[in-house]
Amino acid sequence: MGQLFNLPQVEDINYIQTVRAVRQFFKDYLTLRLMAGDRKFPNMTTMYKITPPNFSNEFHSKVEDAAIHNVDNVHAAQEAVKKYDAIMNQLEHIHRKILFEKFIHNLQDRTIMLDIPYEERQYKREKRKAVIELATTLGIEVLN
C-alpha cells in the first residue's frame, strides 16, 4: 500500500539551502507587509483583516483606474499576509519565536538561545525543526 502523502524526509532536505529559502521568504513577507500597509514588525498574536473600499462607478479616469489597481495590489498583499500569518501561527510557540527573532528581528542565535533559555544543542535542534517545518508547510524546502 502506497503512502497517502509524499512528504520529504528530513534527511532528504538540504538544510543550508532551505535556510536560505526561508530567509528569502521572510524578506518577501516583510515586503508584502509594507505593501499591505503594515509599517511595524508583526506581532506573533495579531491577525490583520482589512477590507478595501468598494468602487461602484462605471466610468473611471486614469487616476481612478490607477487608484483601483493600487487598491487591488494592496488587497492582494493583505490576503497573502493573512495567509502567511495563519501558517506561522500554526507553528509551535517556541518555533515561531525562534523564526521571528532570527529572521525578522535579525537577532544572533546566541541572544535567542539565552532568551529562551535553551542550551546550544537543544536550541539548534529546535531551530532546525522550525525551519524544516515552515519550509515544508510553504513548499519551499530544498531537496538533496
From Swiss-Prot:
InterPro entries: ArpU-like
Domain of life: Viruses
Protein name: Protein Gp66
Organism of origin: Listeria phage A118 (Bacteriophage A118)
